[in-house]
Amino acid sequence: MEIKYLLTVFLVLLIGSDYCQAFLFSLIPHAIGGLISAFKGRRKRDLDGQIDRSRNFRKRDAELEELLSKLPIY
């Protein structure tokens, strides 16, 4: 009976330590890296690139619509 409880506690501690290790070694360094890149202004440059890509996409979409409107309907 005692071994059953001991095994349960051991498994709970093992799972808990695994989650803590994943939190400490993946989430925190990524958060620190994100803050550093935000202070350096890389994030702003990334957003500018996304805006340009969005404009290009809209331009290509409009050109495609124009091309499709000129095609005959069968």
Curated annotation (Swiss-Prot):
UniProt key word Cytoplasm: no
Secreted keyword on record: yes
Transmembrane regions: none
Keyword list, A-Z: Amidation, Antibiotic, Antimicrobial, Cleavage on pair of basic residues, Cytolysis, Hemolysis, Membrane, Secreted, Signal, Target cell membrane, Target membrane, Transmembrane
Cleavable signal peptide: 1-22
Propeptide residues per the UniProt entry: 46-74
UniProt modified residues of type Lysine amide: K40
A biological process from GO: killing of cells of another organism
Localisation per UniProt entry: Secreted; Target cell membrane
GO CC terms, sorted: extracellular region; membrane; other organism cell membrane
Top-level taxon: Eukaryota
Tissue specificity field: Expressed by the venom gland.
Similarity comment: Belongs to the non-disulfide-bridged peptide (NDBP) superfamily. Short antimicrobial peptide (group 4) family.
Record function comment: Has antibacterial activity against the Gram-positive bacteria S.aureus (MIC=20 uM), the Gram-negative bacteria E.coli (MIC=150 uM), and the yeast C.albicans (MIC=64 uM). Causes hemolysis on horse erythrocytes.
Name of the protein described by the UniProt record: Antimicrobial peptide 1
Organism, as annotated: Androctonus amoreuxi (African fattail scorpion)
Source species taxonomy: Eukaryota, Metazoa, Ecdysozoa, Arthropoda, Chelicerata
